[in-house]
UniProtKB/Swiss-Prot annotation:
GO terms for molecular function: D-mannose binding; metal ion binding. Sequence repeats lie at residues 96-118, 119-141, 142-164, 165-187, 188-210, 211-234. Residues 240-355 form the C-type lectin domain. Disulfide bonds join 233-244, 261-354, 333-346. The lineage of its organism: Eukaryota, Metazoa, Chordata, Craniata, Vertebrata. This is CD209 antigen. Ca(2+) binds at residues 324, 326, 328, 331, 342-343. Residues 1-37 are cytoplasmic. One of its GO terms (cellular component) is membrane. Pathogen-recognition receptor expressed on the surface of immature dendritic cells (DCs) and involved in initiation of primary immune response. Thought to mediate the endocytosis of pathogens which are subsequently degraded in lysosomal compartments. The receptor returns to the cell membrane surface and the pathogen-derived antigens are presented to resting T-cells via MHC class II proteins to initiate the adaptive immune response. Probably recognizes in a calcium-dependent manner high mannose N-linked oligosaccharides in a variety of pathogen antigens. On DCs it is a high affinity receptor for ICAM2 and ICAM3 by binding to mannose-like carbohydrates. May act as a DC rolling receptor that mediates transendothelial migration of DC presursors from blood to tissues by binding endothelial ICAM2. Seems to regulate DC-induced T-cell proliferation by binding to ICAM3 on T-cells in the immunological synapse formed between DC and T-cells. It comes from Symphalangus syndactylus.
Amino acid sequence: MSDSKEPSVQQLGLLEEEQLRGLGFRQTRGYKSLAGCLGHGXLVLQLLSFTXLAGLLIQVSKFPSSISQEQSKQDAIYQNLTQLKAAVGELSEKSKLQEIYQELTRLKAAVGELPEKSQQQEIYQELTRLKAAVGELPEKSTQQEIYQELTRLKATIGELPEQSKLQEIHQELTQLKAAVGELPEKSKQQEIYQELTQLKAAVGELPEKSKQQEIYXELTRLKAAVERLCRPCPWEWTFFQGNCYFMSNSQRDWQDSVTACQEVGAQLVVIKSAEEQNFLQLQSSRSNRFAWMGLSDVNQEGTWQWVDGSPLSPSFKHYWNRGEPNNIGEEDCAEFSGNGWNDDKCNHAKFWICKMSAASCSRDEEQFLSPAPATPNPPPA
């Protein structure tokens, strides 16, 4: 194989020499090797240039593809955001609709519980006022207040709308009438208060129209019974051992105090027993007030006499405070003072105590239908 290669090399060398001669070059030593290298260098440069150009073309071809991919990603994101926005909008609307639906459901339930006619609200208000009035009975109420409340209640009951449970209301009214019949004692007033509370609850469920007349009649009888409430003593008077006593809240001289008691059918207090004396003395000392009693020696100095004309019993003389009565400066009228009695000038203004007999109360139901005696108002306080 070496023999075959040598002729080829020789031929290549001869070809190069001929080319150089044609170009006017002189043949020198080592020239052959340099020309061979230069001949191969151009080929290498061409290969390198082609490689660089190919790489550049590849990179340039990739750049539009990257831009296209980024644009596609942005389009996808935009579409996703659009869909998400639409979904959120639908979710918000659904939430609002759900909230509105719940509100309407509650409103529907509330409306479903409403009474059929606006009259029920008026009845409820009337019963509330009636309950408040009766709740204050033990303190400083009057029969006139109860009468007015029952009159208004009677007027509204006549307009009651439909719905049943009349029997329950009828029973409540029967119990209420029975409680009113037992009212002479203050403790019974609480019973009426409870009955009225139950009546209010029953009326809230309303009877049928056909039964309204029966309820109207019951309330009319009840009103008459309340109007004739039998009490041992008028309002603001205190009961003790069959008598009623009024303690004034203002002051007058002795003679004006006598007149004030007479104007209400009573008299300035006349003491008849030791128990009564102790009761009155306690009332006076608790209030820390000096109060006139119906005792004086105006007609004859030293002779003490009650306003009913009876003389002072010798057994009562020990109720005078020590050194009393002393008649200093024309002191002719007796008063409750501290733990005993004192004489003072009759023109001095003091509190006073009236006394009258207590009413006789019968629990017979027929008595409620009979005219009741007029109840005296307390004297101006």
